[in-house]
Amino acid sequence: MGLKLNGRYISLILAVQIAYLVQAVRAAGKCDAVFKGFSDCLLKLGDSMANYPQGLDDKTNIKTVCTYWEDFHSCTVTALTDCQEGAKDMWDKLRKESKNLNIQGSLFELCGSGNGAAGSLLPAFPVLLVSLSAALATWLSF
């Protein structure tokens, strides 16, 4: 005996599959621009650091770099706003976890407490950015 499918059942199954596919594409479409937005944020941060004003005192140096750092995080949250639900929360979680790494001279340490020297920030900066972007890319691929 076997299962007999007439045209109605096949059409219903196809309609459900197409509806699921359309919903998945719509959800994925919301995140289409997230990598472009995130890369734009990184480029903007890089440009700010490259055009960093010379000859400032230490306090002004730290304040300037921390402004760039906070602008980067604001830009990233904006890029994630239209993405799938929870992406902004995941970014905030990654940010908090990165603060807990306690890397001496990191931007989290430097900008969170207002202490430190501008010279100690440069070695940790690229490592931190790569770690954050790799974690974000890994999370968004699932």
From Swiss-Prot:
Membrane topology term: Lipid-anchor; GPI-anchor
Alphabetical keyword list: Cell membrane, Glycoprotein, GPI-anchor, Lipoprotein, Membrane, Signal, Synapse
Record propeptide residues: 117-142
GO cellular component, one term: presynapse
Domain of life: Eukaryota
Annotated GO biological process: neuron projection extension; presynaptic modulation of chemical synaptic transmission; regulation of synapse maturation
Localisation: Cell membrane; Synapse
Function summary: Promotes neurite outgrowth and especially branching of neuritic processes in primary hippocampal and cortical cells.
Subunit structure: Component of the outer core of AMPAR complex. AMPAR complex consists of an inner core made of 4 pore-forming GluA/GRIA proteins (GRIA1, GRIA2, GRIA3 and GRIA4) and 4 major auxiliary subunits arranged in a twofold symmetry. One of the two pairs of distinct binding sites is occupied either by CNIH2, CNIH3 or CACNG2, CACNG3. The other harbors CACNG2, CACNG3, CACNG4, CACNG8 or GSG1L. This inner core of AMPAR complex is complemented by outer core constituents binding directly to the GluA/GRIA proteins at sites distinct from the interaction sites of the inner core constituents.
Protein family (similarity comment): Belongs to the neuritin family.
Record's protein name: Neuritin
Gene giving rise to this polypeptide: NRN1
